[in-house]
Amino acid sequence: MRLPTVLIGRYIPVDSIVHRLDPRAKLLGMIFLISAVLIVPNLLFYLVPGLAIFLLMFLSRTGFKIYLAGLRSLWFFLVFAVLVQFFSSSEGEKIFWMITDRAIWSAVYIMLRLVLIILLAENFSATTPPLLSARAIESIFSTFGARKIGHEIGMVMTIAMRFVPVLALEADRILKAQIARGANFERGKFFDRIRALVVIIVPLLISALRKAEELAVAMEARLYTGEPPKTRFKDIKWKPMDTLYVLLTAGVLVLVLFGRYFVDGVFQYGS
């Protein structure tokens, strides 16, 4: 048994156009694209944000296999979301048992939305160092006069994202240790295998609490108070390419909005 790869929270250093973009531009672009994905009116218009996201993945030069591995790590979450959609709607014509045609379309839409949002989040974390992500959040909040709040939110999000791959590696280490002691996670019934995972979950929670305490002590020892720094070792500079990127992603959102409010839906179940 081997745990799947977790990409969210991992930065992949590659020299690409996407890596060289200003982190503020990438954050704004991600917000625009996620908004576009959430308000898509029909299946046809999923091509608009979908192609934009796949173009970002291609230009980032990190490889499509990495993104697929990241999706595999979240398969249980995706399947659960689809099953919830299957049984959450009783409207429409029944196809099988309690499942209706409207529920099937809802499941298709929620699956597409989740996959595209996950791919976009993976692309952002793979092309943006965690510290620059925090800088981007702080800078955007500073524009509205809330620099301290932006700094705190950025720091919390950075630490949370950095903990994802750390905990994934820790879970893999615990899994190998339990297998070496004779534990078997691949035999038995489904619920038996779920119960067997307790020997991984409990040590993982203890390890997570220990690492969080160590991080808190380290930050306190370095006199971290939560106040944003007055100076920076290296400033981030906005370039014309960043403006172009933000305009293009905003254009994707505008196009989807146009399709939602001015174009008749191809499949009405998605509206």
Curated annotation (Swiss-Prot):
- Domain of life of the organism in this record? Bacteria
UniProt KW keywords: Cell inner membrane, Cell membrane, Membrane, Transmembrane, Transmembrane helix, Transport
Q: What is its main location?
A: membrane
GO biological process annotations for this chain's record?
riboflavin transport
Q: Which gene encodes it?
A: ecfT
One Pfam entry for this protein is: CbiQ
Self-association state and partner proteins as the record states? Forms a stable energy-coupling factor (ECF) transporter complex composed of 2 membrane-embedded substrate-binding proteins (S component, RibU, BioY), 2 ATP-binding proteins (A component) and 2 transmembrane proteins (T component) upon coexpression in E.coli. A stable subcomplex with both A and T components are also isolated. This complex interacts with at least 2 substrate-specific components, BioY and RibU.
Any one GO MF annotation of this record: riboflavin transmembrane transporter activity
Question: What is the official name of this protein in its record?
Answer: Energy-coupling factor transporter transmembrane protein EcfT
- List the record's Gene Ontology CC terms alphabetically: plasma membrane
Topology term for the membrane: Multi-pass membrane protein
Main role? Transmembrane (T) component of an energy-coupling factor (ECF) ABC-transporter complex. Unlike classic ABC transporters this ECF transporter provides the energy necessary to transport a number of different substrates. Expression of the complex plus RibU in E.coli allows riboflavin uptake; uptake does not occur in the absence of RibU or the EcfA1A2T complex.
Tell me the compartments it is located in. Cell inner membrane
User: Hey, which family's this protein in?
Assistant: Belongs to the energy-coupling factor EcfT family.
Chain segments annotated as transmembrane = 38-58, 66-86, 104-124, 149-169, 197-217, 243-263
Coiled coil (UniProt feature): none
